[in-house]
Amino acid sequence: MITGIGCDVVELERIEKVLQRHEKAFLEKVLSSSELETYHKRKAGNSKRGLAFAASRWAAKEAFSKALGTGIRDQVRLTDISVKNNELGAPYLVFSGELKELVQEMGLDCFISLSDTDKVCMAVAVCERKNNG
């Protein structure tokens, strides 16, 4: 049974301005350690790819927090959410810390879809209760 759906759209220009002013603080607040490493690799290759990566992770985490129904607070820390990609490039969510425990206690499977243009990144997240029987 679906327990929540969340959506977030972020303008790349907005994230670009934040990164210009507060790159280190923003990235350390938003990205997990593995995502931070990926961000720097992508940015080194092409600054636009780094920007799109940071924006898509922000959108994904906001969308997930909406699907969970809590927003970003208490046990939901941005750095405890990682967006990974499978071998075909499809994104999926990995949780750590208290958030991992919360998602397990709630019996949830959570899914994410990302899309972007040259101006915006968007994410849609769905949480559903696992069928245990």
Feature-to-residue mapping (PLM):
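Core catalytic alpha/beta fold that binds nucleotide/phospho-ligands
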Residues: 1-133
